C-alpha cells in the first residue's frame, strides 16, 4: 500500500500559541509581525519577539500595579489617567524612563516649595511667655 490515509499516522497536536509557550499574556506573534514590518532590521530572530513581549508585559504590569494602589489610596475602583500619572511620577525608575512622556488628563504632582510654607514660630512664643 502507498502510505496514504489516516490509519497509522499521528494526529496533529492542538496548536499552541507562542505566547502560551512562553507563559506570557502579550502576543508574541503580533510583536514578531510588527518587528518584521517596522524595518528595524532585515531579519528578526525567533527569541527577539518573545523577549520584547516579556519586557512590555513586565512594564505594563508594574505600572498597573502602582496605578491600582494609587486608585485604592483615593478610594476608587477604576484606574484613571490621574492614577497612572501619580504611579509613574512617584516611582523613581519609571519617572526616569517616562520623563519626557505627557499623560493626557494626568495633572501634576502636588508640590509646594518649602520657602512658601508658613514659618514655624512656636519657639518664639515660648520665649516671649517666660
Curated annotation (Swiss-Prot):
The nucleosome is a histone octamer containing two molecules each of H2A, H2B, H3 and H4 assembled in one H3-H4 heterotetramer and two H2A-H2B heterodimers. The octamer wraps approximately 147 bp of DNA. It is found in: Nucleus; Chromosome. Its main location: nucleus. The modification Citrulline is found at residue 4. The modification N6-glutaryllysine is found at residues 96, 119-120, 126. There is a cross-link at residues 14, 16, 120 (Glycyl lysine isopeptide (Lys-Gly) (interchain with G-Cter in ubiquitin)). Residues 1-22 are annotated as: Disordered. CDD domains: HFD_H2A. It comes from Homo sapiens. One of its GO terms (biological process) is heterochromatin formation. It comes from the Eukaryota. The modification N6-lactoyllysine is found at residue 10. One of its GO terms (molecular function) is protein heterodimerization activity. Deiminated on Arg-4 in granulocytes upon calcium entry. Monoubiquitination of Lys-120 (H2AK119Ub) by RING1, TRIM37 and RNF2/RING2 complex gives a specific tag for epigenetic transcriptional repression and participates in X chromosome inactivation of female mammals. It is involved in the initiation of both imprinted and random X inactivation. Ubiquitinated H2A is enriched in inactive X chromosome chromatin. Ubiquitination of H2A functions downstream of methylation of 'Lys-27' of histone H3 (H3K27me). H2AK119Ub by RNF2/RING2 can also be induced by ultraviolet and may be involved in DNA repair. This is Histone H2A type 1-C. Residues 7-19 have a biased composition (Basic residues). The modification N5-methylglutamine is found at residue 105. It holds the Pfam family Histone. The modification Symmetric dimethylarginine is found at residue 4. The modification Phosphoserine is found at residue 2. PANTHER family: HISTONE H2A. The modification N6-succinyllysine is found at residues 10, 96. Transmembrane segments: none annotated. The keyword Cell division does not apply.
